[in-house]
Structures are given as structure tokens and as C-alpha cells.
Amino acid sequence: MVNIVVFGAGGTAGSRIVREAFDRGHRVVAAVRRPEADAPYLPAGVRVVTGDATSVRSVRELAPEADALVVAIGGGDRTLWPDAARTVLDALRGMPAAPRVIHVGGGATLLDPAGTPLLDDPDFPDEYRDAALGQAEALDVYRSSADGVTWTYVCPPPLEFHPGERTGRYRTGTDQPVTDAAGRSVLSYEDLAVAVVDEIENGRFRNMRFTAAY
């Protein structure tokens, strides 16, 4: 059994990660900004607490309970994700037995065959660009860290990523999208949660990013 704290546990990705981890028998703490609003939608038996990944104090209060700390936050402006990355690293720096950090990132940070980030493509949808830039900055924060905190940055597909079915199947890659025979990169939120919890259990991608798709 792994002790897991999930920041953003009330969100689309975070809530599914909570359920996947809980269903596998792990001890899960769901950190949300409004416990009274989110608790009814999370599994009974999960402890729901007030938590903010952009607060050093909040992270330090919850980190001692965790073997893995998941950052699955959304909303707000593009500064949210790099601010959270810096905060979490600052909070864990120097902590004995600091938990691993699993950051649910942005698929647009992945690279095309020429090595260019997908978010730099002129055809990349404008409505997603701001969040993509913020997630790219968060990845840079993790990559530039040298404080002994182990992190993993998880990329869903760049565009075709929606709530759907849990199949328990996916394939992984590192710097480029994983595509099917038709050239599409697709994954459900439910199977992203499977990939995240698999990574918590197995630790294949330490101090690097990975992506998952069918």
C-alpha cells in the first residue's frame, strides 16, 4: 500500500486518480480547496482535506503523510502550473524522506518529429495555448531543479483527451506523442489515472516526462 496525496482531487483528472488509487487499495488523501463541495463526489473512505499546491505551508503539512504527491490542478491563468511546481519543490527541499512528485502536465509540451514543441505549431488551437505555455514552464521548473526531489511529469495526449472508459490499456512514450495506426493520439481520463497510479507503483520514469495513449 502506498500513501498518496492528490492536489486537485476534485478536478477531472484528480478525481479519477483518487478513485483509481483508492480502488487498488492505496491510502489516499484528497487535497482540495473546498472539501464541503468536493467530498460528496469522491469515494467514501478517502480523507478529504483543504489543500493548495501553491502554498508552501499546505504542501509541508500534507507531505509527511505521503510516499507520492500528485499535482493534478487546473483552472486559473498560465502561472498556476509553474507556481505549483516551484512551491512543491520548495516545500519538499531538505525534507527527510520527501515524497515523489507526480505532476499531471500538458501534452502540447511534447515534440513533433523535428523536435519542436507542439504548442509552437501555428495551427495549435489558440484556446489551449495559454495553459500549454504554463505547463511548459512547469516542466522547465522540474527539469532545472537540483534539490534531490524525485519528480515525474505525465503528459496526456495533446488534444484528444476526454472522460470516457477505463480499459486499463495504454502505451507509453517519452518526448513524442504516442499515436495509433491512424496517427491519432487518444486517451481517456480514466486510463490516464491508470497510467499515473502504475507509475506511482512502479517508478519507471523518474526525473523525466512520459506520455500515455492508446
Where in this protein do the model-derived segments appear?
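NAD(P)-cofactor binding segment of oxidoreductase domains
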Residues: 71-104, 133-137, 141
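Catalytic loop of short-chain dehydrogenase/reductase
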Residues: 103-143, 154
